[in-house]
A protein has these predicted regions:
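Conserved alpha/beta-domain cores
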Residues: 48, 56-59, 110-126, 130-240
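A gly/proline- and charged-residue-enriched helix-loop-helix capping module
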Residues: 79-130
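Active-site cofactor/substrate anionic-group-binding motifs, chiefly glycine-
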Residues: 48, 57, 64-84
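Short secondary-structure transition/capping segments
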Residues: 10, 87-91, 178-179
Length: 240
């Protein structure tokens, strides 16, 4: 009934209502989660109960981490988070593809910004019963004067509140973001991020992943692969 009702609404409205219901502890039906030892795996020191996780984009503001973990996800990645709050692109910006059972989004990193989301993360970790892997996905503001500084700011503010950090340079919806994937620029970004990481005791050993776009050409992929190997990048999140 609820799902059918939500499908009658504009997709972004349906998403917002779902988040409000989850925040209010509304008893949305959930399967009783079962753990299977064969699905457990440890990657870069992180113990994942299973490999199926919730990607960034659903819980942009870290409001419903506990609820989503209770559905059985092996991890939840929040964000993308930018230093300052921003509204994102003009609506409508989410479109249903009924026949493909999919959606297209043109959101543009809409989120509440570091300061407010930091409070949400602190609130989540106050619960002694929390369990699960949390990733922090960070990006740059649309109007920033220095994109690299945006990433460094987010890492300093939020890095200690996730099991891993994702550097999002993949979105086509933020002007200039994908330019950070270009040879030279991406290496400068990574080196500055690693320097910042080494300055902060709480995150010095946390994995940092780079999220790249799905439509890079072969030369670009080769450049990123070689740069990643040369700079000991822990991993890539491939496709948006």
């Amino acid at each position: 009934m609820l799902i059918n009702f939500l499908r009658l609404l504009p997709p972004e409205t349906a998403h917002q209502i779902t988040l409000k219901l989850l925040k209010s502890n509304f008893k949305i039906y959930r399967n009783k989660t079962q753990q299977f030892k064969t699905l457990k795996q440890t990657i870069l020191g992180i113990d994942f109960p299973n490999p199926l996780g919730l990607a960034a984009g659903f819980d942009k503001n870290a409001e419903v981490i506990k609820s989503m973990l209770s559905f059985g996800f092996g991890f939840v990645e929040v964000g993308t988070i930018t230093p300052k709050p921003q509204k994102g692109n003009q609506k409508p910006r989410i479109f249903r593809l009924i026949e493909d059972e999919a959606v297209i989004n043109h959101l543009g990193f809409n989120n509440d910004g570091c300061e407010k989301i930091l409070k949400n993360l602190k609130s989540f970790y106050k619960n002694d019963n929390y369990a699960g892997v949390v990733g922090i996905n960070i990006g740059k503001n649309k109007s920033t004067q220095n994109d690299i500084d945006d990433y460094l700011y987010c890492i300093e503010k939020l890095g200690s509140y996730g099991n891993y950090i994702t550097i999002n340079i993949s979105s086509p919806n933020t002007p200039g973001l994908r330019d950070l994937q270009l040879r030279g620029r991406i290496e400068t970004l990574i080196k500055k991020i690693q320097n910042k990481q080494n300055e902060i005791k709480q995150i010095i050993n946390k994995p940092i992943f780079i999220k790249i776009s799905p439509d890079l050409n072969d030369e670009q992929l080769r450049d990123i692969a070689l740069m990643s190997l040369a700079n000991n990048v822990k991993g890539l999140i491939i496709s948006n």
